[in-house]
Amino acid sequence: MSIRRAMSTTASKEWRDYFMSTHFWGPVANWGIPVAALADTQKSPKFISGKMTLALTLYSCIFMRFAYKVQPRNWLLFACHATNATAQSIQGLRFLHYNYGSKEQQA
């Protein structure tokens, strides 16, 4: 019975309209940035660009606000940018520690 209800829900116009809208496909396409940032946390910090990390952090913070303010609220986009802001902040801390940390720890 629940399968039948799920099928009727997914066949509804509202459901199709959501999955064919930019409110869905925009965040889906955008998830590549935080996934790449999370994957890069396993790589050496000598390859981190401080300027790009800062730019991506600010970009995600700005668009988190946009995703919250737009009506209807785009929680999928908000989650994407929150994840990216967190991942980029981690990368930024790794960059700072590697480039400006104490020289004794780097040796």
Swiss-Prot record:
The keyword Membrane applies. GO terms for molecular function: pyruvate transmembrane transporter activity. One of its GO terms (biological process) is mitochondrial pyruvate transmembrane transport. One of its GO terms (cellular component) is mitochondrion. Pfam families: MPC (PF03650). The chain crosses the membrane at residues 18-39, 52-68. InterPro entries: MPC. Keywords: Membrane, Mitochondrion, Mitochondrion inner membrane, Transmembrane, Transmembrane helix, Transport. Disruption phenotype: Viable on standard food, but sensitive to a carbohydrate-only diet, with rapid lethality after transfer to a sucrose medium. It is found in: Mitochondrion inner membrane. It comes from the Eukaryota. It is a multi-pass membrane protein. Mediates the uptake of pyruvate into mitochondria. Belongs to the mitochondrial pyruvate carrier (MPC) (TC 2.A.105) family. This is Mitochondrial pyruvate carrier 1. It comes from Drosophila melanogaster (Fruit fly).
